[in-house]
């Protein structure tokens, strides 16, 4: 079992660590160093049908993704703005031992229905952090938090490397800032796990929630109202 986590190195730069255990309940033993070539936050690992494994990751602002636009860390890096294409999450294939990358991470392109990149100014659709990938109907579903607008949205691709075409919202806003999530299949049903601060009545102290998600005949995820009947 492999537990992936972000942590800052001695220079204050986020990297990805990995800890290994013989049991999902632990104890997990961390590797002595971070994964070479890793950066930013919010790792999510997807294992494809052929057994190949991939890490998706990234987050802007506090997640430092904007500092890596040149491929090297720039402490003065600023995220794109206005009509410029928004930053996309990163993808890297994992080595067979699950402890490293086979190559340098690549940026994932998220585009609209016309094939145009989602602009940085479109905070309803642009990537912010907390990505996840699952596979349904032979297609790859990339879901992520929009951050400031508090949506979980998704984009779809025929190729794991992208580009991913924006489709719409999975979850309307919940209380508690961003909505880091995961999507899993269990007993022939699909479920969304996410967090929400409604129980605490604050914008922090979030609780874990889950709800079933459904797809229409064309594979579109039906938008969820978290506080509806």
Give the residues covered by each predicted segment.
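Carbohydrate-active catalytic/glycan-binding domains of CAZyme proteins
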Residues: 1-229
């Amino acid at each position: 079992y492999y537990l992936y986590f972000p942590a800052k190195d001695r220079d204050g730069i986020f990297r990805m660590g990995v800890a290994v255990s013989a049991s999902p309940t632990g104890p997990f033993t961390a590797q002595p160093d971070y994964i070479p070539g890793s950066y930013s936050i919010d790792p999510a690992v997807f294992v494809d049908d052929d057994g190949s494994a991939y890490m998706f990751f990234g987050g802007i602002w506090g997640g430092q993704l904007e500092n890596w636009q040149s491929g090297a860390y720039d402490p003065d890096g600023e995220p794109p703005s206005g009509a410029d294409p928004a930053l996309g999450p990163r993808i890297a294939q994992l080595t067979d031992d699950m402890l490293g990358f086979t190559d340098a991470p690549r940026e994932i392109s998220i585009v609209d229905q016309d094939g145009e990149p989602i602009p940085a100014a479109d905070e309803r659709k642009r990537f912010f952090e907390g990505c996840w990938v699952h596979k349904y109907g032979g297609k790859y579903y990339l879901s992520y938090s929009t951050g400031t607008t508090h949506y979980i949205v998704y984009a779809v691709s025929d190729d794991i490397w992208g580009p991913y075409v924006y489709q719409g919202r999975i979850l309307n806003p919940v209380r508690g800032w961003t909505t880091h999530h995961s999507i899993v299949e269990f007993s022939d049903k699909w479920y969304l796990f996410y967090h929400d601060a409604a129980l605490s009545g604050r914008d922090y102290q979030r609780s874990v929630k889950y709800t079933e998600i459904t797809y229409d005949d064309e594979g579109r995820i039906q938008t969820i109202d978290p506080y509806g009947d």
